[in-house]
């Protein structure tokens, strides 16, 4: 990781999984989208398309958190996932509603939309983790979805003035979000400890990181 160094520890599960995806990871956190978002120069049509597509991860993401409540092997872990579910409803969904209003996106335009192939592929990968009922596979998806965003969100750059730009950054930085990502990393390192074969987890990891990178292109392709 570039701005967060706690996860990349050689010998631990997350550090090992990250090795083969470093190129895509670095390309994602330094993507044109990220640079323009921080600069406040991102075009509304680009951000609009990105957010409309991103909104359709919400159900799959909630399903992954719910599956972690069900399949985590420790009560303390289950409670932490339950806590995060409440945060998503209060803060992240609130941002989407305000952003759609500011960008003049009608409800039908973000609810009834044709999913981009990248969005659909990412959704399918999330739901496959849910269907697996496998805690390690769920954690892989969450560490990438949250850790990669913390990595770019924590860049030491000035925040843009517009709410729709700055708040999307703020949602993916700060002590609370960093603590959440640290928890996910620690959990994956814990459940992966002693696991001799990381092949399946590595395949899922690499696929998810590649999709994260491709997703940033969506608004520019529209």
Predicted regions and their residues:
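Basic/polar N-terminal segments that are highly enriched at the extreme N-terminus
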Residues: 1-15, 222
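Short alpha-helical hairpin
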Residues: 2, 18-42, 61, 183-194
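Hydrophobic alpha-helical segments
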Residues: 11-18, 100, 125-128, 217
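Alpha-helical bundle segments that constitute or directly flank the non-heme di-iron/ferroxidase center
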Residues: 22-27, 42-71, 87, 91, ...
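Short, contiguous, pocket-lining structural segments
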Residues: 49-60, 87, 114, 176, ...
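Active-site-proximal alpha-helical scaffolds that flank and shape metal-associated catalytic sites
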Residues: 76-179, 210
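Acidic interhelical loop/turn segments
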Residues: 159-166, 189-198
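Long hydrophobic alpha-helical segments typical of transmembrane helices together
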Residues: 192-222
């Amino acid at each position: 990781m570039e701005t967060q160094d706690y996860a990349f520890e050689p010998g631990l599960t997350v550090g090992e999984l990250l090795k083969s995806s470093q190129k895509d990871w670095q390309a994602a956190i330094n993507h044109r989208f990220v640079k323009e978002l921080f600069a406040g120069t991102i075009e509304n049509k680009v951000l609009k398309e990105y957010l409309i597509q991103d909104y359709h991860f919400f159900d799959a993401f909630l399903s992954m958190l719910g599956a972690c409540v069900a399949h985590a092997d420790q009560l303390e872990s289950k409670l932490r996932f339950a806590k995060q579910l409440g945060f998503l409803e209060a803060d992240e969904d609130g941002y989407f509603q305000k952003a759609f209003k500011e960008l003049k996106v009608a409800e039908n335009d973000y609810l009834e939309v044709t999913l981009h192939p990248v969005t659909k592929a990412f959704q399918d990968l999330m739901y496959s983790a849910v269907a697996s009922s496998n805690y390690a596979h769920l954690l892989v998806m969450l560490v990438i979805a949250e850790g990669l965003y913390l990595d770019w969100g924590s860049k030491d750059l000035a925040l843009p003035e517009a709410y729709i730009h700055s708040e999307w950054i703020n949602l993916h930085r700060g002590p609370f979000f960093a603590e959440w990502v640290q928890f996910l990393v620690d959990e994956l390192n814990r459940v992966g400890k002693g696991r001799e074969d990381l092949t399946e987890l590595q395949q899922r990891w690499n696929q998810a990181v590649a999709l994260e990178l491709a997703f940033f292109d969506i608004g520019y392709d529209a």
